[in-house]
Each structure stands twice: as structure tokens, then as C-alpha cells.
């Protein structure tokens, strides 16, 4: 009997030991995964955020019915790009082929290559037209269903701009510049938008936050004001409503970021008007979608952008985050455009790396704010500004980000 008891206790002890070991092993794996993610983000202290233009999938009903009937989204237009001058690289050809941006396996590949090269935030362009979401599948089905999405932080930019009929597909609409979709919203739709983004995105553990506050970016200050009687005060009330709903959802506050479509120099008076309006409406930070002021020479383009950045930084009484563009070539959208409309001289990964290093210095010189740098863009194929590998430079632009952000090759 004693022998049986002894055997029983030995068996029990072994089982318990095994169970404890397995628990510790699993806990260790979870902690290692969590630590790996944290180390990936803390490796350099920089938040390198690339804009994602989510047009390359079969969006239904709006995209399919009104713009791209082939079932591949804007690839339909990108493939039709044609050279306008000698040496003009058109059509743009992705190294990985014409993959759909709402495929979680595709986006999973994006996430791996982005984080390996120093890009750790995606800013998804997000739309609301005709009382419904537009192009949302890229984020909902592509990014959020990618098995490794926790490696990458993300936030949403409400791209609240109008769309002319021939802007996104002149092959279909020709010279018809009438408005296809007006981005202005009424209070009812605005409340739906607020509820939707809080519910769908803000509670995700990898949603990008500043001081614990979810970051929500807005593209057009003009269309925002048009939605609320063209009044700074009424717009402030709408944004305060958003803040209140975010607080009810359990967050300390909302970080509202205003994004201007492109950088440009301001006169003294226009600078005062913009800064006064921004402050009245209660925005928390400002950045650009692209560098703006495009010229043929990328070095001149970049030098202008640095001067514009310095002016805006001095004018604003709130954080301004630097933006670096990969390039610019939107000729696939505009048949009349030619050489003078394309950034093509000195438009190389090395030139981009130099400009990105200047943005890094700017971030270092502003220790009072997060080291956030925005990049135009991750996949703006139709505008010729993308980090994703192509048939011309391969992984050149991603390697440039790694050289600057992770390896510090451009540090002085």
C-alpha cells in the first residue's frame, strides 16, 4: 500500500512539475513575443509612419460601380501609365506584382518587410462618401486580419476631400471634372463616423497613441469646416463631441492631428489665420501628407520642404511632425501632364535617405514631442511615391529607411 502511495505521489509530482514547466514555457513565449515587439518599437525611439493609400482592391459598391470595374481597384489605372518623356519610368511596376491590399497574406508580408527596415506605423487613408465607408477593406480585411499585425502600429487619417469624376479614372470619365463625391458630412453621418472609428479601431492594442490618447488625423480643414457651417466655433463643438465620446470609451483623451495635403510657404497673414483657426478648433498636432511645392529636381524639392518645415514649426504653438516624400509622379491620372509635372532629377534612394536624415535631426531637436516622422508613402503607386519594392530600385527605398533609422549610417 505504501509503495502504491509512493508511486502515486511520484506520478503526481511529475505531472505537476510538467504542468508548471509548460506554463512557464508558454508564459515565457508570450513574454518573449511581447518583449520582441516592444524592443522593435524602442530600438530607435522613432515612430516612422508611412501613409497607406488603400485603393488596390475590389471595393464594393462604390469603387467597383463608380471607378474601377476590372476588380483590381486602381491597379487598373496604374497599369495604363505611359512614359511622357525620354527616361520616364512608367508604368510603375511592383517587384511583387499587382497584389491586392485587402489580402491579409499580402499585408502580412508588408508588415514584416516594413518593421525589418524601420517603418513601425501605418497611417491608413480612410474615407466616407454617400453615407458609407469607402476603401475600408484594406484596413479591415487586409491589415487587421494579417496574422502578424501586432508588430505594426497604425492610425487612421480621415481623407475628407472631394473627388472629381475624372480624378481617379480619366479613362472612364475623360474631361468630366464634375464632383463624384462631396466629402462634406452632416451631424448624423459625423456621429456615425465617430462611433465607427472608436469601435473598430481605437481599442486595438496596436492603435497608435500619444500619451495614451488615440491619434485621429484629418486631411482637409476646409471640408471639415464646411460640414459645420464654415465656423471655427461650430467645428470645435463637433471635435469636442468626438473627444467626449473617446473619453466615454475609456481613453484619457483624443489626439487630433491636422494633415495638410502638401507643404507650402505661408505669408505672414495667412500664417496667422491658419494658426488661429487650428488653435480655436483644438487640434493637438500638425503634419503634411507630402512635401508639396513639387519641382523636377528632388534635391530642390527636398530643400524647399526643409525651409517650409522650419517656417511652419516657428509659426505653430503645437507639435509639428516632419514629412518626407519618396517622390512624385501622378501622370497616370492626368493625360496632359509632362516632364515639368514629375520629380525626376536626383530622385534616388540615396537622395531620399539624406532628406530622411534631416527629418530625423528635426525630431531629435524637439525632445518635448514624440519622434514621429511621416513618409509619403508606403504604396502611392499612382502618385509615384512609394517605399514598396519596384522593378527599378528593388528594395532601395526601404534600405534607405533602415540605413537612416536603424543603422544610423547618416548620423553625424
Residue locations for each model-derived region?
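Bacterial N-terminal signal peptides that target proteins for export
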Residues: 2-17
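C-terminal motif of bacterial Sec signal peptides marking the signal peptidase cleavage site
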Residues: 27-28
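Glycan-processing catalytic domains of CAZymes
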Residues: 37-412
Amino acid at each position: 500500500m505504501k509503495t502504491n502511495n509512493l508511486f502515486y505521489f511520484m506520478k503526481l509530482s511529475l505531472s505537476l512539475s510538467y504542468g508548471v514547466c509548460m506554463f512557464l514555457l508558454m508564459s515565457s513565449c508570450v513574454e518573449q513575443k511581447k518583449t520582441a515587439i516592444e524592443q522593435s518599437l524602442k530600438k530607435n525611439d522613432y515612430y516612422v509612419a508611412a501613409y497607406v493609400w488603400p485603393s488596390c482592391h475590389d471595393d464594393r459598391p462604390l469603387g467597383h460601380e463608380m471607378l474601377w470595374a476590372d476588380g483590381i481597384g486602381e491597379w487598373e489605372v496604374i497599369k495604363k501609365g505611359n512614359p511622357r518623356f525620354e527616361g520616364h519610368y512608367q508604368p510603375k511596376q511592383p517587384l511583387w506584382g499587382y497584389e491586392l491590399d485587402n489580402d491579409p497574406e499580402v499585408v502580412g508580408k508588408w508588415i514584416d518587410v516594413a518593421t525589418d527596415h524601420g517603418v513601425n506605423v501605418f497611417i491608413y487613408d480612410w474615407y466616407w462618401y454617400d453615407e458609407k465607408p469607402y476603401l475600408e477593406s484594406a484596413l479591415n480585411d487586409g491589415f487587421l486580419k494579417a496574422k502578424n499585425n501586432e508588430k505594426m502600429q497604425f492610425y487612421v487619417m480621415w481623407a475628407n476631400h472631394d473627388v472629381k469624376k475624372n480624378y481617379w479614372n480619366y479613362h472612364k470619365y475623360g474631361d468630366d471634372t464634375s464632383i463624384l463625391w462631396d466629402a462634406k458630412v452632416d451631424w448624423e453621418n459625423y456621429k456615425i463616423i465617430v462611433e465607427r472609428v472608436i469601435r473598430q479601431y481605437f481599442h486595438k492594442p496596436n492603435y497608435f497613441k500619444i500619451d495614451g490618447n488615440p491619434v485621429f488625423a484629418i486631411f482637409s480643414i476646409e471640408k471639415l469646416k464646411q460640414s459645420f457651417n464654415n465656423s471655427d466655433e461650430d467645428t470645435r463643438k463637433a471635435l469636442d463631441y468626438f473627444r467626449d465620446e473617446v473619453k466615454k470609451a475609456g481613453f484619457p483623451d483624443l489626439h487630433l492631428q491636422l494633415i495638410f495635403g502638401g507643404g507650402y510657404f505661408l505669408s505672414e497673414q495667412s500664417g496667422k489665420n491658419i494658426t488661429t483657426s487650428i488653435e480655436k478648433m483644438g487640434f493637438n498636432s500638425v503634419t503634411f501628407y507630402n512635401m508639396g511645392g513639387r519641382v523636377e529636381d528632388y534635391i530642390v524639392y527636398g530643400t524647399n520642404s526643409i525651409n517650409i518645415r522650419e517656417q511652419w514649426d516657428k509659426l505653430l504653438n503645437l507639435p509639428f511632425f516632419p514629412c518626407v516624400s519618396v517622390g512624385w509622379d501622378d501622370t497616370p491620372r492626368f493625360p496632359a501632364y509632362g516632364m515639368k509635372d514629375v520629380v525626376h532629377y536626383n530622385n534616388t534612394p540615396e537622395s531620399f535617405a539624406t532628406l530622411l536624415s534631416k527629418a530625423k535631426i528635426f525630431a531629435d531637436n524637439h525632445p518635448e514631442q514624440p519622434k514621429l516622422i511621416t513618409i509619403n508613402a508606403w504604396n502611392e503607386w499612382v502618385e509615384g511615391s512609394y517605399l514598396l519594392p519596384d522593378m527599378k530600385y528593388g528594395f532601395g527605398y526601404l534600405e534607405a529607411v533602415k540605413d537612416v533609422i536603424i543603422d544610423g549610417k547618416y548620423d553625424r
